[in-house]
Amino acid sequence: MEQTICHRVASVEFWDGYARWYKLWMEHNHYHDRIISRLMDNVEPGWRVLDIGSGNGVLSLPLCAIGCEVTALEPSVGMRNLLFAEAFARGMDWIQVDARTLEQIPLYTYRNLDLIMACNSLHLTEQGLAQALTRIFSFNTKRVFLVSELYPGIEALPESEDYTLRFSEYYETESSFAYHHIGEVLDHWTFKKGEKLSDQELRDITKILAVQDDHLWIKDNATVGMFWWEKNQIS
């Protein structure tokens, strides 16, 4: 089943439907806290920022809050709706949104920005992580911030003679899912698979469920890597 899921998540259509599950996941964990903290330590107010695969704005909106000019690149309408809802809830109406994919953007569109960032999104592009990162370097941005989970078969990160890797950091974090009832569990996993679950899959899912704080949990952890490059000559 995991192989089927991995193939499907690389499509925009998958994320249109998965947005409700992403929202549920976000509401019950602190996955992005350390990433946001790193950004706050390194980003300055007024920077022009492009967030590739912004999702619900979990990284974009904190930068908007400190006065950055942020464009959220998000091709999924389902995920954009989460972004708009979150921006409205925070009273932020100045974030810019671009509904194109990375591959659809001409190189001249976002030249000479202060920062381009991507969190768990480049491996979902048509090009794959390595080629997508190489393309980002060609935008001539002053800084690049990449967040990616480490998984079997992950591509080696490309190097660029124009950029220096200023820091890289790996850490373990919780990435658990919390559900309100068993029907929600089964709906989620059925959507991920794209078809009815087999009896064996139902048994396997039931075995890993844990009850905690009036929720059903599927506990999980992820190894996350954070990487920050700077252009060798920043004007």
Could you tell me what each predicted segment is?
Residues 56-104:
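Class I SAM-dependent methyltransferase SAM/SAH-binding core
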